């Protein structure tokens, strides 16, 4: 497990600021900071149109504001999960459960999930999908010496954009959002 004592400073993502490296000094919870974050999220949500892209826009707003806030403020717990990651994974699980119950034409979610909780744990509500594009290294590194660095960057960028497009198309086809994207990088991804 994670037994480190490092903490991130509580701040919102800001490309103009330095990288928020973990520090050994414990971070004090600040009520004023939390109010500022809530106000920022509220202001950002006012500008988001409620349509099929809403969830992805909301996800971006939450990522910008909650990445460096711990999901637990209890002094008895290790605060090593960000509030953003907690919210994102919770939304991914909820969307899987909702899709499964809708496919089963289940109307009474409370009965299925709470009153018959033990049985619901046995249901196949989740699928972990892994994708890997083979041959990426060959594509990236099959380049001549002249302008090699520029060529490597261009090919790497091309693959990243292609992968993001494939992921977005796949998520759209199965009626999921980017909340269900657990990881993407190096020509691979994990989706729940």
Named regions from a protein language model:
Residues 1-192:
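Regulatory and interdomain segments flanking nucleotide-handling catalytic cores
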């Amino acid at each position: 497990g994670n037994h480190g004592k490092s903490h991130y400073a509580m701040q919102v993502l800001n490309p103009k600021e330095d990288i928020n490296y973990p520090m050994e000094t414990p971070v004090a919870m600040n009520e004023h900071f939390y109010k500022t974050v809530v106000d920022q999220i509220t202001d950002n949500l006012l500008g988001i149109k409620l349509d099929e892209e809403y969830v992805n826009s909301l996800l971006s707003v939450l990522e910008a504001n909650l990445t460096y806030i711990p999901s637990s403020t209890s002094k008895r717990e290790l605060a090593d999960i960000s509030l953003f990651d907690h919210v994102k994974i919770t939304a991914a699980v909820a969307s899987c459960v909702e899709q499964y119950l809708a496919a089963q034409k289940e109307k009474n979610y409370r009965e299925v999930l709470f009153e018959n909780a033990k049985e619901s744990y046995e249901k196949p509500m989740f699928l972990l999908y892994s994708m890997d594009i083979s041959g990426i290294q060959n594509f990236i590194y099959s380049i001549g010496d002249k302008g090699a660095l520029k060529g490597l960057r261009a090919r790497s960028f091309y693959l990243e954009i292609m992968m993001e497009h494939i992921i977005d198309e796949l998520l759209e086809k199965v009626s999921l959002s980017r909340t269900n994207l657990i990881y993407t990088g190096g020509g691979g991804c994990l989706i729940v």
